[in-house]
Amino acid sequence: MKILIALSLLLCTSLVAAELPKPTDEPILTIAGLIQNSNSEGAADFDLKMLQAMPQHTIVTRHPWVESRHHYKGPKVSDLLEMAGARSTKLTLVALNNYEVEIEFDDIAEFEPILAWSDNDRVMRVRDKGPLWLMLPIDKHPELLQMPYNDFMIWQLRSIIVK
């Protein structure tokens, strides 16, 4: 029995501090800062294939930047933070143009935001606000249209810094 417990603890410890697989394509997302799991010099890099291999979730919603209801698909932000072994919920989200948003993830965790890579079943390109867009379910929670929530919906997301 003691051996079984010791093996279980060893397995759990190795999962918490596990090495992430390296991306095989160009990374589109980097999670850095206070993280435990990395695959690139203290950071966790993800290519599109890695994000698509994670459990996918869909948010169907309208928002100020589109005229009609859109179907967005991608992994939950909470799953990505867990995979990287984030040790804090204070985040800085950085877009391709270096636009930054400071966010306390606990403030929006209940809404289960996703990092959308697909808009209406099409992979989002940079010209379409891709490759990643933090998406909130505004139709289900109209209060998300108010400040500061709509500021958190950063598009062309390239990195998350855990502070």
Where are each of the predicted segments found?
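Positively charged n-region of N-terminal signal peptides that target proteins for export
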Residues: 1-4
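Hydrophobic h-region of N-terminal signal peptides that target proteins for export
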Residues: 8-17
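N-terminal intrinsically disordered, low-complexity segments enriched in P/E/S/T
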Residues: 18-163
